[in-house]
C-alpha cells in the first residue's frame, strides 16, 4: 500500500508545471514562442509611474505604466502605458505595423500585487510590439514577474 501511495504522489507531482511563485523573485516570458528568463530584473516607482524591467543576453523587456495600483492596463500605441523589447532592434507597443491590413500593437499587464512591506511587485503580461519601420514584430506572451524588487525614486 505504501508503494501504491508513493507512486500516486510521484505521478501527481511529476505532472505539475513549474510555478514561478516558488522561485522568489523572478521575471520570465515567451518571446516568439521561445523561453526567455531574465538574469536580472527590477522595478522603479518615479513620478507616479511604475517601470518593470528584466534582461538577459538575448535582450531586455521593459513595461511602463502611469499608475501604481493593482489593476489591469492595456498596452497600445495610443496609450500612456507601453512595453518594449530590445535586442539589437528596438520594438515597442508605441509602434504599429504596416501592410495591406493595419497591424496594431497590443498587450496587457496585470499588476496582481504591490507589496509595500517587502517592497516588491508581482503580475502577468503579454504584448506584441513592432520596430520603428513597422515591418518586424516581436510577440511576448505568458509573461510573469514575481516579487520583483521596487526601487523608489521620488
Range-by-range predicted roles:
Residues 13-37, 154:
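Bacterial Sec-dependent N-terminal signal peptides
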Residues 1-4, 18:
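Positively charged n-region of N-terminal signal peptides that target proteins for export
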Residues 114-154:
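C-terminal or internal capping secondary-structure element at the end of a domain, subdomain, or sheet
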Residues 27, 44-120:
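Surface-exposed helix/loop patches within compact recognition domains
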Residues 29-33, 54-56, 127-133:
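Short acidic, glycine-rich loop/turn motifs
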Amino acid at each position: 500500500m505504501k508503494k501504491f501511495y508513493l507512486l500516486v504522489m510521484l505521478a501527481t507531482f511529476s505532472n505539475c508545471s513549474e510555478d514561478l511563485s516558488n522561485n522568489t523573485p523572478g521575471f520570465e516570458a515567451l518571446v516568439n514562442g521561445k523561453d526567455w528568463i531574465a538574469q536580472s530584473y527590477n522595478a522603479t516607482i518615479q513620478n507616479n509611474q511604475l517601470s518593470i524591467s528584466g534582461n538577459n543576453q538575448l535582450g531586455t523587456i521593459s513595461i511602463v505604466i502611469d499608475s501604481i495600483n493593482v489593476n489591469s492596463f492595456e498596452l497600445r500605441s495610443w496609450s500612456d502605458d507601453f512595453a518594449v523589447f530590445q535586442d539589437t532592434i528596438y520594438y515597442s507597443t508605441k509602434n504599429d505595423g504596416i501592410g495591406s491590413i493595419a497591424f496594431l500593437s497590443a498587450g496587457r499587464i496585470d499588476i496582481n500585487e504591490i507589496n509595500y512591506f517587502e517592497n516588491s511587485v508581482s503580475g502577468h503580461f503579454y504584448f506584441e510590439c513592432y520596430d520603428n519601420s513597422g515591418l518586424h514584430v516581436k510577440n511576448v506572451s505568458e509573461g510573469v514577474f514575481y516579487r520583483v524588487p521596487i526601487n523608489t525614486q521620488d
